[in-house]
């Protein structure tokens, strides 16, 4: 580009304006070189995101395909009629097919189709459609600026001093709002999360980030029959870059879902809460039912040796992040959501299907927008991906992807047992996982380079919720004991040095009636039981207090592997049901000189000697109770730790 600019400058200012043939030919040659260079640079810099650029005077189209023999965009007056205007596209040297439609096209709809192997493929919205009709069948031409709510230009991400300060709360829009006890008027809608009741609840709980299950346009819910209240988690991508109409108040208006999604994010930001989007780039709802499969057949997917679609997702296909243009698509897509919607983080579903280089490029691109935007995901796949294992973004290679996190199924399995059997975990009486609990507490196992890459959790939308998990592994225990196990397991997460993650509703003792895969179960199974706020107030208040304790003490959030190594030690007693975790020498780091956490995973009271705690101490948690201001103040040289409970002491 700089060379082209030099040529331009030279041609205009330094080639003499003479009539001699030699000078004129030189000028023409230089100008032609400039034009060629500028065209090449323009093609290289073309964004897939800019497939439809609207202005009141014209709309420009640019679609990528390396296989089409011809392409055309079909212009419709509305979302339903068949009559359309076909517009032929011209191919450039970088496989972008372009056309310009003059005049004000706002309110029109479009699809694109490609001709190859002697036939026209089915039409589809563009690969990067940003606004779509009901059920995402056609893309809409809109003015994105007109979808911005009042004050959108002043919207700011809430401050986040350090990534280990994060407490993520995962929920689904319907889970959080559909209950008659939720206090929400616009149930199941983006704008339901702009209302006072849910915002106040989240603020009071003390979480920093709200992770929402997929809310891009997905295919498993018919948006024309929303009155039937059908439910789905949403891991069925159709149009990656438009919100789903099922969460809008008018799915027939392409701008409505965009505006209301922005209103939701704006309201959460005003409440001091960041928003994480659950993204599913690893597969599509089906292949020929979406633009990726129709516009450029097979290119965006990995194939088996026999030409069939690989299936690392377990959903019938897996995408090919290692292919240059799908990698480009993924990078541009997350950046689009970060810029246009002010999204604060991305949770990558089945991240292990993607290659490591793509995740590194996503991280680098987001850093250019805002380095505090989060990236983490599931470091595994459902089945074996069709790509070299050592190059995939699997959990064990997390350290190769700086500042990309992965869920720690290690600490989950150690604390509550594996989701693939009904065995107990440490928090429910099985000491076998004690060493993995310790590794999880320091958030520096062999696979994570830094604590922030270790997502400490015990439950999420997948598998059993915590109440049901404890029920299937310890059915003979009383409810009082099960509640103690619940608190103990979550305490270990909240004092871990990693990034903490809570599944929404666990603090209200939610149950899914024993269903461990509620992806399409009805609201009655999935909703958060707000009516439990009174019945299980003790559990809710414990979660709230533990979040406050974590946020009050930097010792639980040291932030680097080096600091963890310097300040953390374990006291070994020979009792495998006891984990004693001490964070020492905290002067200048924490208000406490040291912190002591004792986790008792047995059914017996255990007396612990505390020779290290020589100063006056504050008892922050004990026997299923917690208070960031202290339950008791006294010097402690020994303490009794109740069954299935955590004791936390701060030494002043």
Predicted regions and their residues:
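C-terminal beta-strand-rich structural cap/linker in extracellular carbohydrate-active enzymes
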Residues: 107-110, 631-652
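N-terminal Sec signal peptide cleavage junction
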Residues: 41-43
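Conserved alpha/beta catalytic core and glycan-binding cleft of carbohydrate-active enzymes
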Residues: 135, 139-142, 363-364, 368-509, ...
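Sec-dependent N-terminal signal peptides
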Residues: 29-37
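Conserved, mostly hydrophobic/aromatic
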Residues: 63, 112, 171, 212, ...
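The feature marks proteins involved in alpha-glucan
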Residues: 45-58, 92-170, 175-186
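Substrate-binding/active-site clefts of carbohydrate-active enzymes
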Residues: 172-196, 200-341, 351-354, 358-370, ...
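Carbohydrate-binding surface patches
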Residues: 57-62, 67-69, 569-611
């Amino acid at each position: 580009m700089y060379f082209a600019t030099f040529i331009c400058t030279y041609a205009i200012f330094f080639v003499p304006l003479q009539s001699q043939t030699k000078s004129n030919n030189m000028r023409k040659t230089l100008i032609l070189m400039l034009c060629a260079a500028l065209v090449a640079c323009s093609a290289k810099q073309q964004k897939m995101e800019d497939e439809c650029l609207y202005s009141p005077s014209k709309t420009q189209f640019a679609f990528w395909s390396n296989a089409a023999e011809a392409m055309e965009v079909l212009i419709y007056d509305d979302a339903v009629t068949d009559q359309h205007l076909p517009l032929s596209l011209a191919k450039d040297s970088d496989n972008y097919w372009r056309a310009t439609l003059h005049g004000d096209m706002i309110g029109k709809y479009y699809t694109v189709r490609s001709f190859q192997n002697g036939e026209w493929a089915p039409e589809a919205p563009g690969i990067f459609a940003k606004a779509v009709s009901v059920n995402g069948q056609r893309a809409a031409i809109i003015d994105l600026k007109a979808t911005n709510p009042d004050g959108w230009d002043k919207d700011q991400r809430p401050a986040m001093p350090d990534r280990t300060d994060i407490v993520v709360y995962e929920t689904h829009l319907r889970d959080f709002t559909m209950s008659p006890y939720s206090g929400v008027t616009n149930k199941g809608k983006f704008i339901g999360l702009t209302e006072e009741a849910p915002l106040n609840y989240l603020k009071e709980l003390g979480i920093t980030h709200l992770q929402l299950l997929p809310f891009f346009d997905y295919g498993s819910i018919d948006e024309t029959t929303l009155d039937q209240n059908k439910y789905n988690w949403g891991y069925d991508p159709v149009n990656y870059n438009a919100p789903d109409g099922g969460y809008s108040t008018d799915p027939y208006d392409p701008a409505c879902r965009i505006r209301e999604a922005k209103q939701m994010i704006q309201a959460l930001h005003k409440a001091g809460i960041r928003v994480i989007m659950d993204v599913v780039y690893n597969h599509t709802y089906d292949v020929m039912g979406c633009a990726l499969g129709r516009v450029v057949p097979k290119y965006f997917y990995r194939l088996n040796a026999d030409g069939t679609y690989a299936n690392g997702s377990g959903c019938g296909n897996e995408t090919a992040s290692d292919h240059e243009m799908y990698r480009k698509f993924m990078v541009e897509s997350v950046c689009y959501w970060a810029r246009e919607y002010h999204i604060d983080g991305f949770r990558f579903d089945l991240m292990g299907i993607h290659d490591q280089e793509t995740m590194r490029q996503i991280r680098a691109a987001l850093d250019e927008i805002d380095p505090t935007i989060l990236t983490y995901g599931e470091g595994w796949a459902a089945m074996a991906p069709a790509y070299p294992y050592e190059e995939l973004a699997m959990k064990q290679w997390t350290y190769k992807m700086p500042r990309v996190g992965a869920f720690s199924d290690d600490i989950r399995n150690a604390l509550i047992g594996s989701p693939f059997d009904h065995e107990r975990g440490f928090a429910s009486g099985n000491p076998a996982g004690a060493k993995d609990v310790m590794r999880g507490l320091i958030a520096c196992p062999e696979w994570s380079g830094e604590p922030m890459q270790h997502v400490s959790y015990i439950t999420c939308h997948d598998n059993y919720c915590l109440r049901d998990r404890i029920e299937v592994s310890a059915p003979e225990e009383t409810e009082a004991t099960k509640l103690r196990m619940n608190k103990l397991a979550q305490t270990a997460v909240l004092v871990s040095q990693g990034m903490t993650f809570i599944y929404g509703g666990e603090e209200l003792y939610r149950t899914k009636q024993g269903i461990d895969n509620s992806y399409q179960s009805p609201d009655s199974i999935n909703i958060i039981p707000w009516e439990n706020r009174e019945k299980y107030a003790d559990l809710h208040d414990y979660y709230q207090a533990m979040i406050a304790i974590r946020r009050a003490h930097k010792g639980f959030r040291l932030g680097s592997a080096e600091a963890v190594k310097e300040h953390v030690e374990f006291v070994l007693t020979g009792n495998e049901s006891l984990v004693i975790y001490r964070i020492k020498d905290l002067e200048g780091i924490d208000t406490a000189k040291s912190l002591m956490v004792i986790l008792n995973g047995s059914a017996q009271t255990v007396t612990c000697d505390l020779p290290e705690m020589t100063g006056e101490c504050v008892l922050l948690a004990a026997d299923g109770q917690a208070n960031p201001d202290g339950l008791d103040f006294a010097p402690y040289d020994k303490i009794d730790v109740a069954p299935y409970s955590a004791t936390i002491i701060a030494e002043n």
